[in-house]
Amino acid sequence: MVIPLSEGDGTAAPSGLRSFVLPVRGGDCRLWGGHHLPASASEALPLLVCHGGPGVPSDYLFPLIGQLRRPIIFFDQLGCGRSDRPSPGEQEYSIAASVQDLVEVIQSLVLEGVIPRRDGLPAYHLYGQSFGGILAFEALSVHHGSSRPGPPPPRSLTLSNVPSSVPVLLEEVAALLAVLGGDGARFDATHVCRTLPRPPALVAAYAPGHPGSDWRGVDVIADWSATERSLGALALPVLLLAAEHDFVTLRSMEGWQRLAQQRLVVLPGVAHHALLETPEAYGASLESFLQDQEEEANCAVSST
């Protein structure tokens, strides 16, 4: 069920987003969601956005609105941002639990028509940035061959700045940090976000007054890697967005090269928050990929 929120509700988002609530985990917890509709009518399919962190709310991805010509659906993961924050624990804040939340989110959005149907099937694109990409990938692959119902498959998946192996990522981070003499501030300015002053959307996501997060950082994903089985199970177009100076290096993304239908785009001169550093180039790469998938699908339908 998708429950609308009034503008005066404390969980409401900035203007331009229609806020709503998504009950998960049997209705015991509520996730905040935000729905953007373009000013002019569009036949483009919606993009469902999974933010990263773990635990950085959706605010830093709101600039997607200005770069894409389509509906966009955001949500804050449990324990983060405007969503409910149950008591911290391994069961509440785990990849498996969050993957199931995402599955329920997608199912609710389809049921309520926020995700439309085309030719009788739910029609949307799925996008994950950083940790959000891990959740998106797991949601689509973990149910392969399982008796548990998974989400309806999207038309495409975008993995933006997402490692295929967190252990390899941690090795890369240690090496990059060593080159900088262990200077965390220089690492941040070189490999996290190279734009100064910091983009307002990123400042907002980390602001002291923000509802915040109960996630415990990278520790919850330290052992995660995409398995050969899950890589082989994913049979849909995938856009891999990388950045020249990102701490999520190409080496830490090598596993994604084994996906059957993948397109790699490396954005020059930017780091982990490439959307905020070079929004036009980022948006053009993403929108071009999404349009390509929709055009190919339309051609396939018209030829049958």
What do the predicted segments below correspond to?
Residues V49-G53, S130, A243:
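Glycine-rich His-Gly loop
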Residues Q261-T304:
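Catalytic active-site module of serine/aspartate enzymes centered on a nucleophile-bearing elbow/loop
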Residues C80-F131, H143, G150:
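Active-site loop/oxyanion-hole signature of alpha/beta-hydrolase fold enzymes
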Residues F137, S141, P149-D183:
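Flexible "cap/lid" loop of the alpha/beta hydrolase fold
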Residues L177-A178, D183-L236:
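Alpha/beta-hydrolase
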